[in-house]
Amino acid sequence: MPAAHSESMNKTKIAKIAFPIAALLCFFPFVSSAAALVLGIVLAVALGNPYVDKTRSYTHHLLSLSVIGLGAGMDLMVVGRVGLQGIGYTVVGISFTLLLGMLIGRMLKIERDTSTLITVGTAICGGSAIAAVAPTIRAKSHEVSVALGTVFMLNACALVIFPWIGHLLNLTQTQFGLWSALAIHDTSSVVGSTLQYGPESLQVGTTVKLARALWIVPVTFLIGLFYFRGQKVEGGAGKAKKPWFILGFLIAAALVTWIPELRPVGHVVETVAKRALVVTLFLIGANLTKETLKSVGIKPFLQGVGLWIVVASCTLGAILIGWIH
């Protein structure tokens, strides 16, 4: 048996043991959000991920359950107020990001579908938006992989960079929560980033991000109409995947708000949900395998980075001068 093949088999065996143990460790409070993400990336790059399909599926389901659990620790009245306040700048932000993203994609001569997926992932809520729009525009599997790989890498960067910038600029918890919700791609990374910054930041960031995620459905519908205008497409323009976990979040918040006796239980559920989110971040890191990193070409990555920098900078500037508050 060749030495290289033997070494590969040994790595796979070690990885099959190491990944479940690492995921279990992330449930404990001594593992931070950033540490969990880094641990997942290191294991994936060093050993490879023998559970790629499972970790992607678990990431989606665990994130949904965790977000619902976070609702059990929040006041519905506060959630409603914060969500309604964010409608105006959410509409402006999504529209601006979609237009700028498509412009950058054309300038860099990136495949139309890949550019659309990266843009919509940046504009709304990362991987969830990409997963919803991909079947609508009939995107090929490699185009979806490139878009997801780009977004996942930027999510990982955000978990480290955003809290550091927040502390450097002495942002308030509300300011940081708003900035994270409007400038970080995925809900999981928004929660991971704001979780490091403070409880008020977590509440604001989660609420505004979930309100933003609701735009998956209308934006996906409009993209479908734009792509196939003038064409008769069998089965329609595709169906958007509805973010049902947002409804679960609102129901959980309503229960603890309207039934005070449930609040002690709600706090326990919220605590467990926060730890589950740390595990989710580990799984996100575990999805950044060598294959994923190689699949992202330089042009799509430049589009993702350039668009993200502009969106994050403009949003931060608007928050600092008081346009967004």
Swiss-Prot record:
It comes from the Bacteria. Pfam families: Cons_hypoth698 (PF03601). GO terms for cellular component: plasma membrane. The chain crosses the membrane at residues 21-43, 58-80, 87-105, 115-137, 144-166, 211-230, 243-260, 302-324. It comes from Bdellovibrio bacteriovorus (strain ATCC 15356 / DSM 50701 / NCIMB 9529 / HD100). InterPro entries: UPF0324_pro. Disulfide bonds: none annotated. Belongs to the UPF0324 family. It is found in: Cell membrane. It is a multi-pass membrane protein. This is UPF0324 membrane protein Bd1437.
